[in-house]
Amino acid sequence: MPPDPAFLMASHLNDIKDNELAALKKKYGEPEVHAFTADFRKFECTLVKRTEAKGRLHDITCFIRQDDGNFVVIQKPQYARTGIYRAPSGGANPGEPLEDAAIREMYEETGLTVRLTRFVLDMHLEVVCKDRTIPWRSLVFLAEPVVGEIKPVDTREIFDATVMSRGQLVGEVAQLMEDSGWGGFKYRAFLTREFFRRLDELNI
């Protein structure tokens, strides 16, 4: 008999283990919690559902700050040459520690080995699709580069990686995201602005 939908939902919501999250908070600080709701387009919902089918409903996003204060950002093939860039992100594989996943994903997407420095935001997103609403979670960190050259390793997933200023990210890039009509970009614009607002509050 098929699994109980309520059981599946509970297991998906718990794809981030409480004890691992507690350890990250202890090591990198208590994040500010936010909720956001966005209407996703059909193709966006398809991508989220594909990830959900693999048992993952989260991402780890890292704002990698260089010594000059600029941030490493990526662009994917789906929106290549649009002017839209965002902080790199990715998810943990089954059984993979979240911190290890963050470091691996940052290397694959940017070519940099990074060190996490502060747990800034714990974002809870409601992905609104025509047939249902899907819960998503983003754990957002400040990070710093340790070694490497900015050059995507996973060139199938990443079209470009570069650096941008805070002003660009919260200004023209966030506006392009909001004007795109994509629910995912509306969420990323909100996440980006909240990240920098919280960074100011923390004075880091």
What annotation goes with each model-predicted range?
Residues D39-A87, V114, R118:
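N-terminal strand-loop-strand
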Residues V120-D122:
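A short glycine-rich, hydrophobically flanked beta-strand micro-motif that places a catalytic Asp/Glu
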Residues A10-T61:
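Acidic, metal-coordinating catalytic segment for phosphate/diphosphate chemistry
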Residues M1-A10, P31-T37, Y79-S89, I103-E108:
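Short N-terminal helix-initiation segments at or just after the protein's N-terminus
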Residues D4-E20, G90-L98:
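N-terminal short leaders/motifs
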